[in-house]
């Protein structure tokens, strides 16, 4: 499983979904899907824009959790 930490990053800065969408140029639905961890796939350009906006690395935004650790 891949966990997205977008909600944490946004919470630390008290940002709303629309704020991130406006600043990054990403569609609101894309940001919302990542925020709610419902995204099934994410384009590299979206990851790049989010990393630039939050000044973070991909590993700060996403975390791989092996299936055995979920139990």
Predicted regions and their residues:
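DNA major-groove recognition helix of helix-turn-helix/homeodomain DNA-binding modules
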Residues: 45-60
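Recognition helix of helix-turn-helix/homeodomain-like DNA-binding domains
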Residues: 26-41
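The alpha-helix within a helix-turn-helix
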Residues: 10, 21, 51
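A short, Lys/Arg-rich alpha-helix, primarily the initiator
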Residues: 1-16
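Conserved hydrophobic/aromatic packing and binding residues within compact polymer-binding modules
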Residues: 6, 20, 31-34
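Short, charged recognition helix plus adjacent turn
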Residues: 8, 33, 62-71
């Amino acid at each position: 499983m891949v966990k997205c930490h977008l909600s944490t990053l946004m919470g630390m800065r008290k940002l709303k979904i629309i704020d991130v969408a406006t600043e990054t140029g990403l569609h609101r639905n894309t940001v919302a899907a990542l925020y709610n961890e419902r995204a099934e796939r994410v384009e590299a350009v979206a990851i790049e824009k989010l990393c630039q906006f939050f000044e973070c690395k991909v590993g700060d935004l996403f975390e791989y959790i092996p299936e055995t650790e979920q139990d």
